Amino acid sequence: MTVLGGNVFPAWLFAGSKLDDFTFPQSTDTIDSKALYASDVRRVLLPDNLVTGDSVMADCRRLTEVGFPADVVSFDFTSLHGCDSLRVLMFNNIGYIGYHGISNMKSLETVEVRGVVAHIDGWFCYRLPSLRRVLFRGDVLTTGGPGVAQDCPLLEKVEFGGMVLLSWLSDAPGCPLLKKCDTKGSVVYSNNRDFLPSMSLRGDGDGEALNRKIVERVEQANKGPFGKVVGTLYDLAYNLACGFSMAGDTAIALRYLAMAVDKEKCRYGHVISDHDLDNIRNTVGYRALLPKLREQSDYLYILHNCNPYRPGSYTDGKTFTYAKASDERMKRIRQYFRLDSIAGGGSDVDKMKRVMHWLHNTISHDGSGGYPDGAAHNAIDLYEACMKQQRGLNCRGLADVLSELYMAMGWPSRFVTCQPRAYDTDGDCHVITMVWSRSMGKWLWMDPSFDTWVTDEHGVLLSIREVRERLREGKPLAINPDANWNNRNKQTKEDYLYNYMAKNLYYLSTHLHSDADIEGGPLKDGDEYISLMPVGMDGAHPGGKETNDDDWFWQAAEKTLHGKK
């Protein structure tokens, strides 16, 4: 069947169809989620400059041939999941292959890309029991990481035949036959040079020749359909600086570092500690860049020097309110998850830790995942969607779910969006949960993304407010020793508190009323979105109604345990 007309092919349109052959018109630029899901199609021909939604052809178990065009812009999450008759996938030029983009296909043996790849995510190959080789014949501009593949027991070869600009690939868990990647071209920057060897320059001008090729390739990509995928030279500049520094070309390294600083594409704390830049550390050019860089991104310095709050300035008389454990939805959550069994015995703090630990181990953190399509934004529906789709949630989703679990247990809780000063250009915010402990008479910091709480030097658990004040005042802080990301990467207080959270505690935003489904559409009656701002930053608009009154923003929960007033 040939489909006629329209730029967007709607979600689910031919899901479950009995069609044997499917050709999309060249005018189609987007195929939405599950468009051909679980159909009987055997052959699909795709149009140029294509963007796909997730699971476009998932569970098409009779599919044996996919005709890819000259240029595919994006091939996203689980697009071919469960297509068990496919043995070979052969792309031409492709802008983006997403996380688990090629996954759960029993017969797939070979993935080959003949042209240019703008970006591949980490773990783009996942659970492919017959996969033996992944071949990139052309240039690969950037990769995610750390895994090139996961749970592909027969995978023995990953080869990069062209230039690789920037790679964060470092392992292949569940792929025992693959020890490292093969390279035939220049690898400008590799985060793990044992797994993906990087270049060394001869020092006779070949650095300038390579740099001309890099500039040409990036400009060429930006003029074509992949521009939004690869980014500009400014986006790549910092890691190119690292690559040329390690290769011994100081002049080119400093040019790229200056470009990164000028466009705010690097962080002070990282630059001064990054051993990749050691070869240029003592140059005049490097030292001249540091003052500007510190004003941009020394996050402890910025937080320490920000204006104070103005306690008592909020006069509207409103209070923060919380769903009661006796509410029907909260009762259902408590029973559905068997929260009393998860929480166990001991103090309320002991129970809070166990509930967070259970959530952390049950739903993984996926920073690019967002909320599942079609799922209501409440703990039960989000949990069921994650289990069914074998997916995780981003920090907002996890903090939202944890807040509901806590309220179902009778503990007032909010999730709080923590944002940087440069929130309008830095989209890397973080969302955590605050929960009221009756035994301690205070709010506590709980972060399900990293299974983390924060203490003072005596082991006393702290609130978000206390952590922020201690960072500003230089007082000691600690995190629990088992804090981690997805039970893979251990967290340290230096990275988590003094870099990541110091950046993200400039603005703080939360809902006036906390309940299930509070983000499942427009704000509910009686709810507002409130942002706590340092004095003088009014009008920055990180979200919602603004206040400088930290006493009001962090008001005790005991006064408002009976729902909305």
Which functions belong to the PLM regions below?
Residues C306-L393:
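Secondary-structure boundary elements
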Residues M1-V8, S17-T30, S39-V51, R61-S74, ...:
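Structural signature of tandem-repeat unit edges
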Residues R472-K565:
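Low-complexity, Gly/Ser/Thr/Pro-rich intrinsically disordered linker/tail segments
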Residues D400-K475:
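Hydrophobic/aromatic-rich core segments of domains that either
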